[in-house]
Amino acid sequence: MYEQGGIPVGCGIDYGSSNSAVALAYPDRVEVVDDAAGEALAPSTLYLHRDGRRVAGTRASELFFRSGHERTICGRCSLAEYGVSDCRQFRRAGSCNDSRLLWSVKRDLANLGFAGTNSWAKDFPVTELVAVTLTHLRRRAERACGEEVTRVVLGHPVVFAGAGGDPASAANVTGRRRLREAAAMAGFEEVELCPEPEAAGLAGDQAPGTVLLADFGAGTYDVAVLHRSPAGLTVEALDGVDVGGSRFDEVLFETVIAPELGLHELPSWLLNELKSLSGVMLLMADPDLRSLLERLGGPASRAVAAILFSGHAYQFYKAVEAAKIELSSRETAELVAEVPGLSLRATVSRTHFETAVRPELDTIDAVTRRALAAAGRRTEDVDVVAVTGGSSQIPAFQRLLRALCPSAELRREAAFTSVVRGLGTRARTIWSTRDALTG
């Protein structure tokens, strides 16, 4: 329920790999904004149609599953400005789908080799793709408050997916620059950035002490060492690594799906792309893949064709994620993935899962210790370990942090909204103060 009264000074947006959220910043409070169905999270999925429609959020998936099979044959297409030879799809295949569903775009923000995608004789820069989601969230905020919202504090990972461990690397600098550009394209006139774990710290309990803030999301793991005192919040160290919950999904694909379907018979490059949704996007856009699978032949190739070309790839990979989530509350999970032409059922144990992701957990442990060392803190100095992010509910992750800081209190922040609430808090601080000074 929203409080009445007041004009917001800005907003905070947590743009995530899987989900995104927005919070309005008022001079006296911060409100996370729900959609009409009462949901704070908007899936970070995009629907693109050849007729010009650009849709973000839950509606994107609904539209694609209704029309994703529709195609236009070259010769009947009027979108290529200089004729069909101007169109990549014509040069490659002779037809194209009328719509596309994109997800995990955030994972490509810092990819120096990825400028965007192409469909219907048009380039879609990655900044334009991100701007669709940011525009969706800005409009949600404006509907909630009845005012124009042109200021935003955008969260960003300490280290972007695929960008290496140095926050100052060219790839990470590019990721932050692209976020700013996307926000401007979405209609924001004033844009500030804030590291996601720092934002989560702003939203947490403000009791004095040293806090290890661990933000384990879908795309990255970020950690902040914070110290709260009567004078305020001090950020003593920030670190991160491009290991997120989606990497754990990939491990399940490697160790459960691939053996069950015999996919290890495939070329290694193809199997590597199949592990992730971002890889699947590239495969589905490759006009030569169908003919390659036909040449390879065999059960594995037929399984891949069923996954990619039945119109149900998204549901297939969400089933893998669902099994991972179920293992956070149960000792075993049933991985049920069914698409036309393919039915897979496998029982996965938590023991198998935790053994399989041990290398990723070791990486998280090393990054956390590195952050503490950079802050000049010993593990016994930590008063509170605060965890946030959708992947922070994984029991093995929480055990790792308990073992690292056994004397600290483990506090579970709001897994999906603590970052956006903190970004809203930062927006309130920045622009309430600035407006007071200039008013």
Placement of each model-derived feature along the sequence:
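Phosphate-binding glycine-rich/basic clefts of nucleotide- and phosphate-handling proteins
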Residues: 41-48, 228-339, 435
